[in-house]
Swiss-Prot record:
Transfers the gamma-phosphate of ATP to the 4'-position of a tetraacyldisaccharide 1-phosphate intermediate (termed DS-1-P) to form tetraacyldisaccharide 1,4'-bis-phosphate (lipid IVA). HAMAP family: LpxK. Pfam families: LpxK. GO terms for molecular function: ATP binding; tetraacyldisaccharide 4'-kinase activity. It is an enzyme of class 2 (transferase). ATP binds at S54, V55, G56, G57, T58, G59, K60, T61. The lineage of its organism: Bacteria, Pseudomonadati, Pseudomonadota, Alphaproteobacteria, Rickettsiales. This is Tetraacyldisaccharide 4'-kinase.
C-alpha cells in the first residue's frame, strides 16, 4: 500500500493537480467499471457502513467507537469489520488481545477494546467468521466505496476544515468519489470537528440528516510539561489542534505518513528531538499501539466523539438498522 501525506494541492488547486487530472479520469473509469461488474452479497446481519468520500482522517474510527458503545448500552450484539490498513494481514481474522498493529492494523487493535472485531482486506472473506459470531448488527469501518456487499445504513464522515478538498478525484485531489452521490444516499452525515454554527454550503441540502460532532480528549494529561507531538494519521493537523485546545504546551511536532509502521530508528530520532526540546513525546492512540512495550515514555492522547444530536442518531439507527 502506498502511504502518502496530504499534499497542499489536494486542498487548493494548482498546476500539479491539473497535470494529474488525466490519471484521475482513469481512476474514475475504473471505479465505474468495478461498480458495474460487482454482484453485491448480503451479509448475515444488518450492516451499518461508516465511510468518507476523501482520503485522510475524517473521524471514522471515533464514530465507530461511539456506535459500539451505543449498541452495547442497548444490549445489541455487534461485530466491527475493519480494513486492516498498514498491516501484513493475508486473510480475514477475528482479532484477539495478542494481535499487534502490524498483524491486523492499528484501528483493529483499538476497536477490539469495544467489542468483537474482524480485520480483513476482502469483504467476502468475513462471511464464515460472521456466521460463527452471529451478530445482530455489523459495523463496517470504511468500505463505503466497496460495491461487493449490501449496506443497510450508511454514515458519511466529513472533516469540517478540509471538507472535500479541491474537488478532484485521486490523485489530482483527495476524493475517492464525488460527494453528491454519497451524500444523497447517506442516512446520516457527520460534520466532524465542527465548532461553528454555520453549515458549509455544500452540506445545506442535507441539514435534516446532519450531525455536528467534535473529537475531544477523553483522558487526563499533565499540562505543566512541555510536549513534542508526532503522528502518522490521516489528519495530523486536527490532532495538533486538539493538543493545543486541550492546553498543552507543544514545543515541536513531526508528521509521518498515514498508518506509518515505525522503525527503531524512528523511535530513537523522536526521543532525540524530544530531548532537544526539553519535552515529553505525545502521540495518538493509533500511533501508540504500534510501539508495544517500547512506549512507556510516550504519552498518548485518547479522544472520543461528542455529538450535538444524540437523539437523531438513536432514532435513525434503531429505526432503520
Amino acid at each position: 500500500m502506498i502511504k502518502l501525506l496530504y499534499p497542499e494541492f489536494w486542498q487548493k488547486r494548482n498546476i500539479i493537480a491539473y497535470l494529474l487530472l488525466p490519471i484521475s479520469v482513469i481512476y474514475q473509469f475504473l471505479g465505474y467499471l468495478r461498480a458495474s461488474l460487482a454482484r453485491p452479497i448480503m451479509l448475515p446481519a444488518k450492516v451499518i457502513c461508516v465511510g468518507n468520500c476523501s482520503v485522510g482522517g475524517t473521524g471514522k474510527t471515533q464514530i465507530v467507537m461511539y456506535l459500539a458503545k451505543l449498541l452495547k448500552a442497548r444490549n445489541v450484539s455487534f461485530v466491527i469489520v475493519t480494513k486492516a490498513y498498514g498491516s501484513n494481514l493475508t486473510s480475514a481474522t477475528t482479532i484477539h488481545q495478542g494481535h499487534t498493529a502490524l498483524e491486523v492494523g492499528d484501528e483493529g487493535v483499538i476497536l477490539a477494546k469495544y467489542g468483537a472485531v474482524i480485520a480483513t482486506k476482502n469483504i467476502k472473506e468475513i462471511v464464515p467468521l460472521l456466521n460463527e459470531l452471529k451478530p445482530d448488527i455489523i459495523i463496517v469501518d470504511d468500505f463505503l466505496q466497496n460495491p461487493y456487499f449490501h449496506k443497510d445504513f450508511t454514515i458519511v464522515s466529513v472533516d469540517s476544515q478540509r471538507l472535500f478538498g479541491n474537488g478532484f478525484l485521486i490523485p489530482a485531489g483527495p476524493l475517492r468519489q464525488y460527494p453528491n452521490k454519497a451524500l444523497d444516499a447517506a442516512d446520516l452525515i457527520f460534520l466532524v470537528s465542527s465548532h461553528q454554527d454555520k453549515i458549509p454550503n455544500i452540506l445545506t441540502p442535507y441539514v435534516n440528516k446532519l450531525i455536528n460532532a467534535q473529537i475531544v480528549p477523553s483522558n487526563n494529561i499533565d499540562k505543566t510539561k512541555n510536549y513534542f507531538a508526532f503522528s502518522g494519521i490521516g489528519n495530523p493537523e486536527r490532532f495538533f489542534a486538539t493538543l493545543k485546545n486541550y492546553g498543552l504546551n507543544i514545543t515541536g511536532y513531526k508528521i509521518f505518513p498515514d498508518h506509518y509502521n515505525y522503525l527503531q530508528a524512528d523511535l530513537e530520532n523522536l526521543y532525540s528531538l524530544a530531548k532537544e526540546h526539553n519535552a515529553t513525546l505525545v502521540t495518538t492512540r493509533k500511533d501508540h499501539v504500534k510501539f508495544n512495550d517500547l512506549n512507556n515514555n510516550i504519552v498518548c492522547l485518547d479522544v472520543e466523539l461528542s455529538i450535538n444530536h444524540p437523539d437523531l442518531l438513536n432514532e435513525k439507527i434503531f429505526k432503520k438498522a
